Each structure stands twice: as structure tokens, then as C-alpha cells.
Amino acid sequence: MTWRATVLTLFPDMFPGPLGQSLAGRALEGGLWSVEARNLREYGLGRHRVVDDTPFGGGAGMVMRPDVVSAAIRDVAPAGRPLVYPTPRGRPLRQDDVRRYAGGPGLVVLCGRYEGVDERALEACGAEQVSIGDYVLSGGEMAALVLLDSCVRLIPGVMGSDASGTEESFSDGLLEYPHYTKPASWEGRDVPDILLSGHHAAIAGWRQTESETATRTRRPDLWAAHLERTGCTDRQF
């Protein structure tokens, strides 16, 4: 069954964009997934297809109208597909979320613009509000591309090796270990000897240690969650 993505946006020409290249592009051509970009302007009001209005309570910018947004959502009929709204106000997008989305029939992604979407439309349509980081973009389209790419690569048959999806950052709650390739020595920097040893158990242990070290130093939030999940303490590492 083809994994279906529908994107509701004011800029449909942004899709598939970079998702038409590389692994995602080949999977798109091969029918492993599909993407349809619907122009929210089609659901706008009046001769000028108005999609936004001034915010109640005052303030800068414009807000996307609930009647326009909800009409678009109901027209695409998510049919079991989660409705996701990328926004800095959302909960952090996690790899567990990505796996859940990728394991289903697809996604409907609503891309906001201006000051965002009227909250009533999001509540009425049961949108999942997710954030890809603590920063602000011009609109939801770039975040939608990030979200879709993270999902598409987990669809069976997209990546060349199943291990690629299980031996990477966040697959076990830790950041991934570092990678090396030829030449073995480059500008005075050598590949760690253990990776050249052929001792698979020792290599696996080294990679685990490197993952733990990177997570502890770069992502203390993930490290704290790892300690809680495993029941270990810092002193044991």
C-alpha cells in the first residue's frame, strides 16, 4: 500500500521540492509513497480568495481563518491519517512520532503562514501540533518537508539496508556513534584502531560507548531520559 501525504499550503509548488531527489525521489517514482499539495487559496473567501484576517485582541500580522482551514481539511478527508500542524508552539517532534507516522497509511500536513492558524480550527480537526526546533520559520512548508523526509526514509523499501534505520541517532534513545571511511589516515588524523581490528564485538562496544558519550555531552535531556529508562546512574558509565 502506498504511503500517502497530503500537504495543505499556500505554496503548493514547494512540493515535492527536495523530496523529489535521492532516496525519497526514487521511492516517489517507484510508488512507495505519494504527495499531493493542495492550495489553501482554493478554499478562500470571495473573489480574492481571502484566507486570513486580523487577530482578535490586536497585535501584528494576520491569522489564517478557521472556516477556510477547516474546509480544506474536511475536503481532503484524512481517513485514518494523522493531521499534523508544524508550529513552534507544538511539542518536540521525536523519532517515536516519526516511526508512528511512517507505520500508518500516511499524513495530512497543514502549513501555517502569517501568525499561524486560528486555534479553533486546530482543536475542531484534532490537529497534532509538533515543533522541529526552538526557532521560527517563515511558514510551515520547510518544517513539512523535514517531517515528510523523516517519515519517508522509514517506509519499507526506501533505504537500502534495514539496519540504516535501526543503527542511527534516536533509534535507541541515544545519538549515533561517529563514522569513518577511507583513507585510514588523513591530514594526520587516523581512524580509531579498533575499527580496523575486525573484532565485531569490540567494535560494537566502542560504538555504544561513543553513542553514550556524545549523548551525555551534547544532549543532556536525552541522556537523563536514557538513565531513567535503563535505571542506571552517571557513575555507571
Swiss-Prot record:
Catalytic activity: guanosine(37) in tRNA + S-adenosyl-L-methionine = N(1)-methylguanosine(37) in tRNA + S-adenosyl-L-homocysteine + H(+)
Name of the top EC class for this enzyme: transferase
GO biological process: tRNA N1-guanine methylation
Superkingdom as given in the UniProt entry: Bacteria
InterPro entries for this protein: Alpha/beta_knot_MTases, tRNA_m1G_MeTrfase_C_sf, tRNA_m1G_MeTrfase_TrmD, tRNA_m1G_MTases_N, tRNA_MeTrfase_TRMD/TRM10
Any single Gene Ontology cellular-component annotation: cytosol
Keyword terms, alphabetized: Cytoplasm, Methyltransferase, S-adenosyl-L-methionine, Transferase, tRNA processing
HAMAP family per record: TrmD
Entry similarity comment: Belongs to the RNA methyltransferase TrmD family.
Name under which the protein is recorded: tRNA (guanine-N(1)-)-methyltransferase
Organism: Gluconacetobacter diazotrophicus (strain ATCC 49037 / DSM 5601 / CCUG 37298 / CIP 103539 / LMG 7603 / PAl5)
